[in-house]
Amino acid sequence: MEEDRLVFETSKGVEPIASFAEMGIKDDLLRGVYQYGFEKPSAIQQRAVLPIISGRDVIAQAQSGTGKTSMIALTVCQIVDTKSSEVQALILSPTRELAAQTEKVILAIGDYINVQAHACIGGKSVGEDIRKLEHGVQVVSGTPGRVCDMIKRRTLRTRGIKLLILDESDEMLSRGFKDQIYDVYRYLPPELQVVLISATLPNEILEITSKFMTDPVRILVKRDELTLEGIKQFFVAVEKEEWKFDTLCDLYDTLTITQAVIFCNTKRKVDWLTSKMRENNFTVSSMHGDMPQKERDAIMAEFRGGTTRVLITTDVWARGLDVQQVSLVINYDLPNNRELYIHRIGRSGRFGRKGVAINFVKSDDIKILRDIEQYYSTQIDEMPMNVADLI
């Protein structure tokens, strides 16, 4: 398998841009990005946004979990002209879920610029697609089969399309979409910008890039930016949900030795836990996606500056942030999917900080915990009594 993977280097001259504000994107789009909960661009966003919004063809080798979907959303929203109701950007994805997720992120990030996007996917009514497309959208995110069908019916008009994005291209090819991708491409205007994103680059992908692209910028983003190395991971078995709170109170003195982040799965749980901790005279701060950006910025600044030591939050925080001085993370709730686990407790290898993660686990969570262990080939042991000495 490995022989057909080329050694892939990032093109010379691709400089990472450390903040969204320096990317030259529209102010209202920047508002949408912050509102969505991003604070700092991920590695792929730092490298790919600028070449794409300046009109270059781009090949990005990146896996899921690198922030590629929001990178796509950001660039598409920057490029389209929302005053025109023509389709200007087309994104093809291998699965309905990914296409729908991409549409959601575009609508969320593009909220203040009033972008219109629609997911053209199998399993939804063709009538709905026709209605939406005739009403006018600037962006279509879809699966190759349905998009091809809509183009052939002349419902999806292609003359205004200036950007084609092929997401998870290797996955599209392995699902047998090659012919449909070529079919769609044939209908698109000749002056087309093409962006291809793929975790692997087999020869079939390189064939697409040589046929569809001119002098592409190459960007390689390894997912190993986040690592569990150097992080001691433990679990505490709690019989009932109510017992988690007592366990947390017992651990509070340990938490405040350093700074700690406590993750809950819902905003309601964050609010509930924060007020319950305060009722019991514990000092904590909290943050989640429903708070106004100003308030979130203030809370983050306090936490970064060390004025507050314990932060209770949802996954909004996990995705876009890198507070390296946090050496203790508590999963009050285990994350809903295993990718989020590394976003919550992983460290970027560059800093190589040591850390401790403690997972509160009810008996019905054991299976999820084992699944996480297996997925990351890591070991999560029962928490020892002297956990304070490890921090």
Curated annotation (Swiss-Prot):
Span of domain Helicase ATP-binding: 49-219
EC numbers: 3.6.4.13
Record keyword Mitochondrion present: no
Pfam family, one: Helicase_C
Reactions catalysed, as given in the entry: ATP + H2O = ADP + phosphate + H(+)
Primary enzyme class: hydrolase
Keyword Ligase part of the UniProt annotation: no
Q motif, short sequence motif: residues: 18-46
Disulphide bond pairs: none
InterPro entries recorded: DEAD/DEAH_box_helicase_dom, Helicase_ATP-bd, Helicase_C-like, P-loop_NTPase, RNA_helicase_DEAD_Q_motif
Function description: ATP-dependent RNA helicase which is a subunit of the eIF4F complex involved in cap recognition and is required for mRNA binding to ribosome. In the current model of translation initiation, eIF4A unwinds RNA secondary structures in the 5'-UTR of mRNAs which is necessary to allow efficient binding of the small ribosomal subunit, and subsequent scanning for the initiator codon.
Family of the protein in this entry: Belongs to the DEAD box helicase family. eIF4A subfamily.
Protein name: Eukaryotic initiation factor 4A-3
Organism in which the protein naturally occurs: Nicotiana plumbaginifolia
Highest classification ranks of the organism: Eukaryota, Viridiplantae, Streptophyta, Embryophyta, Tracheophyta
